[in-house]
Swiss-Prot record:
Source species of the chain: Danio rerio (Zebrafish)
PROSITE patterns reported in the protein's UniProt record: HOMEOBOX_1 (PS00027), HOMEOBOX_2 (PS50071)
GO cellular component: cytoplasm; nucleus
Known function: Mesodermal transcription factor that plays a key role in somitogenesis and is specifically required for sclerotome development. Required for maintenance of the sclerotome polarity and formation of the cranio-cervical joints. Binds specifically to the promoter of target genes and regulates their expression. Required for hematopoietic stem cell (HSCs) induction via its role in somitogenesis: specification of HSCs occurs via the deployment of a specific endothelial precursor population, which arises within a sub-compartment of the somite named endotome.
PANTHER family linked: HOMEOBOX PROTEIN MOX, HOMEOBOX PROTEIN MOX-1
Spans annotated as Disordered: 136-158, 226-253
Molecular functions (GO terms): chromatin binding; DNA-binding transcription factor activity; DNA-binding transcription factor activity, RNA polymerase II-specific; RNA polymerase II cis-regulatory region sequence-specific DNA binding; sequence-specific DNA binding
DNA-binding region extent: 170-229
Classification via Pfam families: Homeodomain
Protein name as annotated: Homeobox protein MOX-1
KW Zinc (keyword) present: no
Keywords, ordered alphabetically: Activator, Cytoplasm, Developmental protein, DNA-binding, Homeobox, Nucleus, Repressor, Transcription, Transcription regulation
Deletion consequences: Defects in somite lineages. Secondary trunk myogenesis is reduced, as well as appendicular and hypaxial muscles and their progenitors. These cell types derive from the external cell layer (ECL) and ECL cell numbers are reduced. The endotome is expanded at the expense of a second somitic cell type. The resulting increase in endotome-derived cells that migrate to colonize the dorsal aorta generates a dramatic increase in chemokine-dependent hematopoietic stem cell (HSCs) induction.
Gene transcribed to yield this protein: meox1
């Protein structure tokens, strides 16, 4: 038995015989009277010729199934608890750097086309395109800009119309004098073209008017009287008196 084992170890070209020597505990046809093969004699007998062929792990021993490539395996591996990993690609976030994340994702999943499937890859690419640089996002930005511009224009138009209405209302607020008030004012104007502050106060109290209303009426009446006189320039005395009257009289609303 020891000679057969040593002969198996010396021959480097005997593949099947060497494998049979190492695997089978019994030799050839004799199975009853021969003791089982043990590894202890190999460890004890350190022969020189045996040391030359000690590296037989790659030829004699059967390699593990995972040592061969996937194509060379005779039987496919079956694992009960193994689940196929689903590739999930998160949609690329919109950034200002362009489509660099999308290109990197497309290159990374290019080798997994057969296993992951074309549908998921198409979904990932579609998600990548839904960023700031996608064709659908550009019209949305333009629409928002146009809507904001229209809102500003409408606001400006409303403000201008409100200002115009307020100006019109301010201009339309005119005092409607009665016939009795006009008669008293005309009588006073024939005697005094310019009123003192005390006299203006008395007229306002008697006619139920404000001092400002009396003052404005006398100013308008003087302008009308000057136009009626034939366009003669007013004397400096009249202009100074008019200015003093306007400055001395407080405006009462």
């Amino acid at each position: 038995m020891e000679q057969s084992a040593s002969s198996c170890m010396r021959s480097p070209h005997t593949g099947g015989a060497l494998w049979g020597c190492v695997r089978s505990p019994h030799s050839g046809g004799s199975g009853a009277g021969i003791q089982p093969y043990q590894q202890a004699p190999f460890a004890l007998h350190q022969k020189h010729d045996f040391l030359a062929y000690t590296d037989f792990s790659s030829s004699c021993l059967v390699p593990a199934p995972h040592a061969y490539p996937r194509e060379d395996r005779l039987y496919p591996e079956t694992h009960s608890g193994y689940q196929r990993t689903e590739w999930q690609f998160s949609p690329c976030e919109p950034r200002g750097r362009g489509q660099e994340p999308c290109q990197g994702a497309a290159e990374a999943v290019g080798a997994e086309m057969d296993s992951a499937g074309g549908d998921r890859l198409a979904g990932a690419v579609t998600g990548c395109l839904e960023g700031d640089y996608s064709p659908q996002s550009v019209p949305a930005v333009d629409t928002e800009k146009k809507s904001s511009k229209r809102k500003r224009e409408v606001t400006d138009i409303q403000d201008s119309s409100f200002k115009a209405d307020s100006n019109c209302k301010a201009r339309k607020e005119r005092t409607a004098f009665t016939k009795e008030q006009l008669r008293e004012l005309e009588a006073e104007f024939t005697h005094h073209n310019y009123l003192t502050r005390l006299r203006r106060y008395e007229i306002a109290v008697n006619l139920d008017l404000t001092e400002r209303q009396v003052k404005v009426w006398f100013q308008n009446r003087r302008m009308k009287w000057k136009r009626v006189k034939g366009g003669q320039p007013a004397s400096p005395h009249d202009l100074e008196a008019d200015e003093l009257d306007s400055a001395a009289s407080p405006s009462s609303e």
